[in-house]
């Protein structure tokens, strides 16, 4: 009887099927931020934790600022999973200062992006790196071998799904009849890894390299902006310019060569759509759309609290496949 009890106890401890916690990290409260992070944590550890977002449902998290009271409340949780490339890094610092026992996982550890933060998850390869960061960090906090084994198996499933998604993108875009899309911002350049030409009509601050005869008055007249505004923006005290110096003009313009290229493609009937990550776009793109009867196609970047999901059947994978279908509208027309 005693041997049987010891055997059953061993099974309970190894499998996690006990009447008590088999690990301090089991049945914990985890706070995440945006949908891409929530999806990873839920996929890897959702069976063993209650997962929340620090943001209330329905708010615009880009404009929403957590109160000190909320930060202190979240700091009392067991684990905060965040993206150090975003404002969440500041929240993590405040929380750990409030509670030194709070465990942290940085999903973007060791990662960077070229154009926009959304590249970290819209590129399936990058997203897999984020998943590995979560998996490895959970493994550092968890001692129960059964839980670690479950996380590893969940990661293998995620790895398969993301690798398959990346392969689908590669195959579909490689077979596309047309290899160029037009977008209203640089974010879409993440598609260049699939050998797709992305012409961006993003408005950027004008950056000038000063030539020998340049003056601030000339620059002011050319861009219809006051000298004082240019001085203030560049933290300059006087109008003295040095050859080779870089000056920023605080107005946003689209690169003329890109705009002319798009106009040429439109005149040749090669462009029917302009891609955006928003339902609104800049005035130049809007004018192009109105004048040439083009369509603005909104790409779901998943950069929100719920990822733009409209029902429980939608996930990161289904939305990424829907985005691929949107790309095919232009590339396979």
Feature names for model-found ranges:
Residues 17-209, 222, 229, 245-333:
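Extracytoplasmic metal-acquisition and chelation regions
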Residues 211-245:
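LysM (lysin motif) carbohydrate-binding repeats in extracellular/periplasmic proteins that recognize
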